[in-house]
Amino acid sequence: MQKKRIWTNARLATMAAGLPGLGIVEDGLIAAEGDRITFAGLASDFPYTEGPSTQGYEVTDCGGRWILPGLIDCHTHLVWAGSRADEFERRLAGASYEEIARSGGGIRSTVSAVRAASEAELVAESLPRLNALIGEGVTTIEIKSGYGLNIEDELKQLRAARALGEVRPIDVETTLLAAHTLPPEYEGRADAYIDLVCNEIIPAAAQAGLASAVDAFCETIGFTPEQTGRVLSAARHHGLAVKLHADQLSNLQGGALAARHNALSADHLEYLDEAGIAAMAQAGMVAVMLPGAYYVLRETHPPPLEGLRRAGVSLAISTDCNPGTSPLTSILLAMNMGATLFRMTVEECLLGTTRHAARALGLEKATGTLEAGKLCNLSIWDIDRPAELVNAMGLNPLHTRVWRGQ
């Protein structure tokens, strides 16, 4: 028999699309059976007559606290080995991201460490980062590969990411990012490496069921639009969703390229142009903001938020947790950065880590809002108003986190 639970005396920010703003319900109640929400709304509308305790429910009095959906970190590179703190010092001394990458640092530095690590070592090194995000109410996380750059080590990274979801109460969505950078053994042979990605790595990941999506780094220090298009086409051929690191450091028309391949999202987007915005809007894509990388790289060209808003493109926000350009393990701080650096509104930040983040992962039917039929993923907060989650820095007001009803 499935466990039945009720959370009463709560204020809800349901994030439901059918309600204005954050979908606030002041005198709210949530009921769940097993891992699914069966009711979320006004307590007075809940259909019982003799009191929930007499109907086999376990009742939790929330004491007037706020309940939001469990938070979603929809773009991370959380599984890695080694440290790139030395690059932080180099950037402080004036080196650019491109200079570090071209000198053999950056992603390639992490590739060497990941290739040398076992799957168990990757899990052990990644757990503290995952624990930090879980501690801030995250119940769903996307984790990319991209530090193996060959069949064996890309699959090893994906297995480690999946293993994290087996040892912690969290839903892990895995994304293959083999087209992250050119491995050293393919120096000067980018097209040959893309052949490997398309003809061997993507099919292997799909056959093993280790990835639900494929990503690529379309950039001057990554891969050309033509090479990226090949990767996205191969992903589609093997039944995988696609997303894209696009227009972060330059305008290569990455947003429009992602739209042509019906991507779930395009991410970063600092140099996205009007044509890219229009293409993304027409394709119904999500624009994922990653202010952590913008902050660490001390960029000065923010994403075109006003254009995205005018076009009706949904905005998500994520930590981009990675060892070099965004070693950020706080979804709350990511929201603050999005508001401060990009001028995102509180509503955009909160929807961007719930409903719109779910859409960026293709999970909008399962999670991201407090609605009947959705997974019972909740975050319960000691706050007076939801804006505090975006405003405060260094304070974690999480009271309780509920994952799949538990």
From Swiss-Prot:
Q: A single GO BP annotation from the record?
A: L-histidine catabolic process to glutamate and formamide
Q: What is the designated name of this protein?
A: Imidazolonepropionase
Tell me the Pfam families matching this sequence. Answer: Amidohydro_1 (PF01979)
From the Swiss-Prot or TrEMBL record, state where the protein is found.
Answer: Cytoplasm
Organism the protein comes from: Hyphomonas neptunium (strain ATCC 15444)
Gene Ontology cellular component annotations, sorted alphabetically:
cytoplasm
Q: Which cofactor does it need?
A: Zn(2+); Fe(3+)
Q: What keywords does the record list, in alphabetical order?
A: Cytoplasm, Histidine metabolism, Hydrolase, Iron, Metal-binding, Zinc
